[in-house]
Every structure is written in structure tokens, then in C-alpha cells.
Amino acid sequence: MEDEMPKTLYVGNLSRDVTEALILQLFSQIGPCKNCKMIMDTAGNDPYCFVEFHEHRHAAAALAAMNGRKIMGKEVKVNWATTPSSQKKDTSSSTVVSTQRSQDHFHVFVGDLSPEITTEDIKAAFAPFGRISDARVVKDMATGKSKGYGFVSFFNKWDAENAIQQMGGQWLGGRQIRTNWATRKPPAPKSTYESNTKQLSYDEVVSQSSPNNCTVYCGGVTSGLTEQLMRQTFSPFGQIMEIRVFPDKGYSFVRFSSHESAAHAIVSVNGTTIEGHVVKCYWGKETLDMINPVQQQNQIGYPPTYGQWGQWYGNAQQIGQYVPNGWQVPAYGVYGQPWSQQGFNQTQSSAPWMGPNYSVPPPQGQNGSMLPSQPAGYRVAGYETQ
């Protein structure tokens, strides 16, 4: 049993002045060390190392004693490491395990990757945290270039949690990476789903809308929809400026700080499962009102037609990429209702939401009646309502 117990530790967040000799000197005070291997990053990032003990009990004691201790002014991170030999043994002798369904494993999203980072790079970076069942950098199908994010899957949930906590903000290939739980796409059922849903590419999605559009529509979460759930789902893709959820309708809007972050979110989350529901993601429509608020009075209260939506995106046929047959898209007219959705306490119509520093009174209808207000910042592609 002793031979099967881990004896190797990962030691990270080291100062560049730390040497193998110093690490051995410190860790040998806890127990006899078999060897120490220092890994120096050629890109100039902080080094890390692996320390192997002769006995598991000494390794466990070193983990407890050294994790969080300052060495040359830096608080080091110590964890169990998966050595290359044990990694090879596990994968070669566990063909049944390797073919398990992906939902039996625990998946970590890795974002903000440098273009040169490969699958082998992220696998090597996350290997110290436990047994990895899969790792990949997502590439564009057309160009073969990295999309700037990837996934690492662990057999053990604790290993995945630890990797998320320890690796978030660490430098890899010249960039600080972001980590979070990944929302994985479920196996496609034997139905029309696969034929109706096209695998989206980043280059395709990013060009489908104006560079000023940073808003993602996410629909299909018919139960359990909350702002916290949406923030947890979309935060790995970039800074979120605003979230609006409509639990009774089953959809939400997420506004990012950049067009590129929103595009990454659409590509990654579209078709995934959230709270047991397969969701659809595509661009929420931002109107020209946000650029030229003077024209606000002429557009409030009138939903865009199907043709207008297609003209905005340049080609109405592209709608099928985001709205497959049978998917019910909320019409713009839903915003004519008083704000009573989650996050809004008003029960009567109020001034339309124009974004920061904008506010205009609702327009006058016939006989002095007030037309329902609508948020000019958000507009969903949809059909005319009666």
C-alpha cells in the first residue's frame, strides 16, 4: 500500500532566486528527499519545482508545513503532484475509465490563454494538481488557431477545485490565465438537435454583430434562473458590466465590457446544459439609440421587423445559426410590459433604460396616454407581435 501512496509534491509561486539546493535544504528538514526538479519558464515567468520523498508520511508532513510559507519573500503553494510515471500508468491501465462519460469527470475552464499555448502546455501546467482525464486548447476549425481558452478535466472533484483556486491569476506564456468551472456540452441526443444546431466558430460569431455590441442573449433556462447563476456561467469569459434575468420567460441578457468577450461566451455556452436545460446563446441587439439618443423618440414602442434584424446583421439567412427551427424567440414587444422581473421592483411603467447618464420620459400616445417603456439598451431579435 505504501508504494501506491503519493510521495511527490508540487511547489509553485517561487521566487526566481530560489534554487534546487535551497528547496532540498528546506524540505529535507521534514524528511529524507529522493530528488528535486526545478522547472524554469523560458518566457520569464516564476519557476516551480517537484520534490519527491522516500516516504508518503514525510511528503504529507511537508505539504502541511510548507504550503503558504514564505520563501525569499514569496508565499509558496504546495500540493500533491502527479508524476509523469504515475500519469502514464493510470492512463494506460484504465481504458474503461478513460471512456467514461465526460459528465463523470470534473471540468475546469482555462481562459485568457496566449496564442502560442498548446494542449500539452496546459496539461503540463495543471498536471501537478491531480489525475487529468482530458485537456485541450480550443482551436478555430477554419484557421487552426487557438481561440484563447481551453479545458482541463480531472477524475477527482477536489483536484479540480484546487486547480481552480491555485491557478487563477497565474502566469502562463506571458498572460495571467483565468480559471473557473466549465459548462460542458452534453452528448447530442439522437434527435433533430444535432442537425439544427451548428457548431459555432469564434471568427464567425464575432463578425455577426457590430463591434459595439457586447450583449449576449441566453435562453432556455426555464427553471432556476437567477442573476447569480448567469454570473457564475458567464464570468469566465470576461468582465461583466450588467446582467438582466427574466425567470418567468426563461432567458437573460449579459452585457460584457468588450465585443470579443461576448463572442467567446456565445461560442462556449451555446448548446451547453445549465440547470438541466440546453441553452441557446446569440447576440442581443443593441440599437442605434445607444449611439444617437436623439432619435429615441422615433423608435420607442415599435419592435424591429424580421427584415430589420436581418439587415442589422447583414444577412437574414444567418439567423438560422442562432435560431434553429422550433426555437421560440421572445419578441421585442415583451419589453413593453412594466418592469416586474427579478432585480426590478417597479410595478408601473418607467422611463426607458438608456444606459449610464441617459434618461428620457415615456412618449405620449393617443389622448395623452403613456406608451409602455422599453429599455433601449437591449433588443432581442424576434418576430412582429400582434
Swiss-Prot record:
One of its GO terms (biological process) is apoptotic process. The keyword Acetylation applies. Residues 355-376 are annotated as: Disordered. PROSITE patterns: RRM. Residues 7-83, 106-184, 214-286 form the RRM domain. It comes from the Eukaryota. The RNA recognition motif domains RRM 2 and RRM 3 are necessary and sufficient for binding to uridine-rich target pre-mRNA. The RRM 1 and RRM 2 domains are required for the localization to stress granules (SGs) and for the recruitment of TIAR1 and poly(A) RNA to SGs in response to stress. This is Cytotoxic granule associated RNA binding protein TIA1. It comes from Mus musculus (Mouse). The lineage of its organism: Eukaryota, Metazoa, Chordata, Craniata, Vertebrata.
